[in-house]
């Protein structure tokens, strides 16, 4: 899958248990361990300031609020390193209208009211699609990384040109391949290469059926009994439990080809940016995986994925 999968959140943050245990849900203000807990909706597990002894489930500041404590902002806003205020920054791409330079993505300048890559058609300092126009990818032409139009699904691709496949597609077996097209036992490099709606995910390079949920699971950094898009949740939120039950973190049937086709069309029509914020073109593109997310905690939209899920629903898409 292309580099855009640093992609996603709209609703969630990823947490992977670091010891053999199950995951529990934690309320705002409570001490948390990002390797074993899931903070409730609207909070993240972070030290609220540099002198805090513990990480807690904390509500991050948002636009125009003080971020001097956590040095991070909600809604993908940028914590200005000087003012320590959450601001809009780096959210516009090549060709979009700007009034100040910090609106443009890093490596771009605001010239004549537009965000410009001064070395175009070279991809520029970002070495990514951020230096390219909407409808273009960044690929090696034998000499340098240059911006070129995307190539269609079904067209030939290789290591050098894989960056020209659509951002939500992958270069699989030498062909730009649309997501969700992989049948059982077909080759894959990412979960989204497989037909998720049919309960498939990518395991050891093959589209594989998600097994029946386990009722006696544990999670470690390298081994997770829960496979596919699932999390090992402790029974009755009991933080003394050592085993739990696998809970689906998405509604598999909701992740359809039609939804991905719409997502693909939206992403291709927008320029890439350093940070996707509310004013970014990409903010209107809803990843179907985010739309299909389940709340594994009754009051939480923060989701824990197992160690093998190469997917993060985050709204900061640095290499989209």
UniProtKB/Swiss-Prot annotation:
Lipid-anchored residues (GPI-like-anchor amidated serine): 298
GO BP term (any one): cell adhesion
UniProt keyword annotation of Translocase present: no
Signal peptide: 1-19
Function: Cell-cell adhesion during development.
Post-translational modification: Contains 18 disulfide bonds.
Transmembrane segments: none
Alphabetical UniProt keywords: Cell adhesion, Cell membrane, Developmental protein, Disulfide bond, Glycoprotein, GPI-anchor, Lipoprotein, Membrane, Signal
One GO CC annotation: side of membrane
Note: Loss-of-function mutant (antisense inhibition) shows reduced cell adhesiveness and forms smaller aggregates than wild-type, though it does complete development and produce fruiting bodies.
Residues bearing glycans: 49, 80, 141, 158, 187, 216
Disulfide pairings: 39-57, 67-79, 73-86, 98-110, 104-115, 123-138, 132-147, 157-171, 165-176, 188-202, 194-207, 226-246, 232-234, 266-285, 270-281
Membrane topology listed for this record: Lipid-anchor; GPI-anchor
Residue stretch(es) of the prosequence: 299-320
Protein name from the UniProt record: Cell-cell adhesion glycoprotein 64
Subcellular location: Cell membrane
Primary subcellular site in the record, as a coarse category: membrane
